[in-house]
From Swiss-Prot:
InterPro entries: Ribosomal_eL30, Ribosomal_eL30-like, Ribosomal_eL30-like_sf, Ribosomal_eL30_CS, Ribosomal_eL8/eL30/eS12/Gad45. It comes from the Eukaryota. GO terms for cellular component: cytosolic large ribosomal subunit. One of its GO terms (molecular function) is structural constituent of ribosome. Pfam families: Ribosomal_L7Ae (PF01248). This is Large ribosomal subunit protein eL30. It comes from Zea mays.
């Protein structure tokens, strides 16, 4: 029960940091643009929803490994990630180019 509260709090923390990035930073939404930013070495952090198709997920992780970029696996599905970004559509993956006022890159635990 305590672990559930901690997960909920960390999810809220990531959601708040994502909202701050959406207001003050630069980002791209979507699979094709995430791959483009990874190939051009512009991305600083990639966030992937947990229901992203496995082939897409592995391809994004491969390009992120080549570009030495941290990948964070979001604990919600693509609808939850879209809502956390403040959008009214589904977001499977997003790339943060400039975090702006947010410290999401320093505090987000990433898996590569």
């Amino acid at each position: 029960m305590v672990a559930t509260k901690k997960t909920k709090k960390s999810t809220d923390n990531i959601n708040n940091k994502l909202q701050l990035v959406m207001k003050s930073g630069k980002y791209t939404l979507g699979y094709k643009t995430v791959l483009r930013t990874l190939r051009n070495s512009k991305s600083k952090l990639v966030i992937i929803a947990n229901n992203c198709p496995p082939l897409r997920k592995s391809e994004i992780e491969y390009y992120a490994m080549l570009a030495k970029v941290t990948v964070h696996h979001f604990h919600g599905n693509n609808v939850d990630l879209g809502t956390a970004c403040g959008k009214y559509f589904r977001v499977c993956c997003l790339s943060i180019i400039d975090p702006g006022d947010s410290d999401i890159i320093k505090t987000t635990p990433g898996e590569q």
